[in-house]
Amino acid sequence: IYYIFINGGNGSVAAGYRLSENLKKVGYACRLIVIPKTVDNDIAIVDHAPGFPSAARHTVITISELVHDMYTYDTDLIMAVEVMGRNTGYLAAAAAAAGKTGMGSGFDLCT
């Protein structure tokens, strides 16, 4: 094996780094190529990491459907939804932006 492609987020990159260091120690000539992909969208210098746009879309659709269900049942319940994002709030921000621009079902989010 001369090349290894690693596609993933923080954990995958860290594992690739450890693998690279171990391969260097034993003198194995192999190149590791990291392809960043994360729903957290927390990769430095990258505006939209692969994985984030589809996760944001799924989050907006899911919350819109939940809001529709709440309107259907006509209750005064309050719904809390927690989304992924590690130490960032990009998915929550995407859902909030969609709700405020009419792309969602007119929901309000506290971010």
Mark where each language-model region is.
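Accessory alpha-helical/coil subdomains and C-terminal extensions
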Residues: 6-8, 14-18, 22-29, 33, ...
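Short gly/pro/ser/thr-enriched loop/turn and capping motifs at secondary-structure boundaries
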Residues: 13, 38-42
